[in-house]
Amino acid sequence: MKNVLSIQSHVIYGHAGNSAAVFPMQRLGVNVWPLNTVQLSNHMQYGHWAGSAIDAAKMEQLVDGIAAIGALKRCDAVLSGFLGSPAQARAAVEIVRTVKATNPNAWYFCDPAMGQTGGIRPEPGVEEFIVAELPELADGMAPNHSELQKLAGQRIETVAEAVAACRLIIRRGPQVILVKHLHDRNSPADRFNMLVVTETEAWIGQRPLYAFPRHPVGVGDLTSAIFVARRLRGDSVRAAFEHTLAAVHAVVKATYDARRYELELVAAQDEIARPSEWFGAWVTGAD
């Protein structure tokens, strides 16, 4: 069974960061080692919360502890999400380097959280660090539309522009870019666009966009987690993308139908593993 070290925020109540990522990856047959960068009572969109960030040095100490018992060599991938400070971001880089040195076959998937995540805003300097340092280290990245523009340093309004931006980033190191949410001026307003791009291929997919009174938090974290899990299970990029599109839709639909604010991960767990409604991806902007 594959193992992934997941470095993200965590909420006790609800689903954001590792609280949105761990169970879906486990449900898909992947062992998850959660390292929580932030421990909160709940996500901050509620307006009240309690909790704090973990010290960056302790992040590295925890991973050193795994290495000390000889288990780090079994880590097949690292997934990073919210990093609250430049010190945490640097610690994540050192952790990835340690994992890759221990297991040369391990890979790193970066969800470059640069804006507000569950109401949490990273400290000044995190965005600049991510843009400058992480593409060279990452084997894959999962930006949203805004983060893609920051990574590429350009405005994006169409699918073609998004594909070109992804290819700019790919030249710096990643083999695959998953755009978790793409705004396209040519797409229908009731559709949610996702895009995945490699050096030579690109696929776009759409799912229904639901009119929530207030949108649930953690959908992006769920998206990255499912994609990583399916890739660890051996799916091709396209197959992992299509499974991610379908499974995330199932969770979002279950949440909308139940009139809930927090993602209905447990209720929709069978759909995460075996989605009943699929949305085929089609080739776009391929060389």
UniProtKB/Swiss-Prot annotation:
Record-level Gene Ontology MF annotations: ATP binding; magnesium ion binding; pyridoxal kinase activity
Entry-linked InterPro entries: PM/HMP-P_kinase-1, PyrdxlKinase, Pyridoxal_kinase_PdxY, Ribokinase-like
Record's keyword terms, sorted:
ATP-binding, Kinase, Magnesium, Nucleotide-binding, Transferase
User: SUPFAM superfamilies, alphabetically?
Assistant: Ribokinase-like (SSF53613)
Catalytic reaction list? pyridoxal + ATP = pyridoxal 5'-phosphate + ADP + H(+)
State the Gene Ontology BP annotations: pyridoxal 5'-phosphate salvage
> Which EC number applies?
2.7.1.35
Q: Name one GO cellular component term.
A: cytosol
Stored PANTHER family: PYRIDOXAL KINASE (PTHR10534:SF2)
Q: What does this protein do?
A: Pyridoxal kinase involved in the salvage pathway of pyridoxal 5'-phosphate (PLP). Catalyzes the phosphorylation of pyridoxal to PLP.
Q: Which family does it belong to?
A: Belongs to the pyridoxine kinase family. PdxY subfamily.
Subunit details for this protein?
Homodimer.
Entries under NCBIfam families matching the protein: PRK05756.1 (NF004398), pyridox_kin (TIGR00687)
Name of the protein: Pyridoxal kinase PdxY
- Cite the source lineage: Bacteria, Pseudomonadati, Pseudomonadota, Betaproteobacteria, Burkholderiales
State the gene name recorded for this protein: pdxY
